[in-house]
Regions:
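Phosphopantetheine-dependent thiolation modules in NRPS/PKS and related acyl-activating systems
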Residues: 2-47, 51-83
């Protein structure tokens, strides 16, 4: 577990949560363009991020409403949790 995360680790978490190949993940992926990104997948993303960030993600309210890779990255950058 870590106190910060790399973009490629975010991509890997999202790919696994959406059950799609990691090579398909980029900053434009969102719930608007991937039907796989439903509420259950979003919850799985949040749980995996929280585990990777040693419990820090659960304290970031904005993540619960971040339904895109770009938004997740922006929030983690703002909170200084992105390497």
């Amino acid at each position: 577990m870590s106190k910060s995360i790399l973009k490629k680790e975010i991509f890997k978490i999202i790919a696994k949560s959406l059950s799609i190949p990691e090579k398909m993940i980029n900053e434009n992926v969102s719930s608007n363009n991937y039907e796989e990104w439903d509420s259950m997948s979003h919850l799985n993303i949040l749980i995996a991020l929280d585990k990777k960030l040693s419990g820090k993600a659960q304290k970031i309210q904005e993540l619960s409403e971040a339904y895109s890779v770009k938004k997740i990255i922006q929030i983690l950058e703002k909170k200084k949790l992105l390497k």
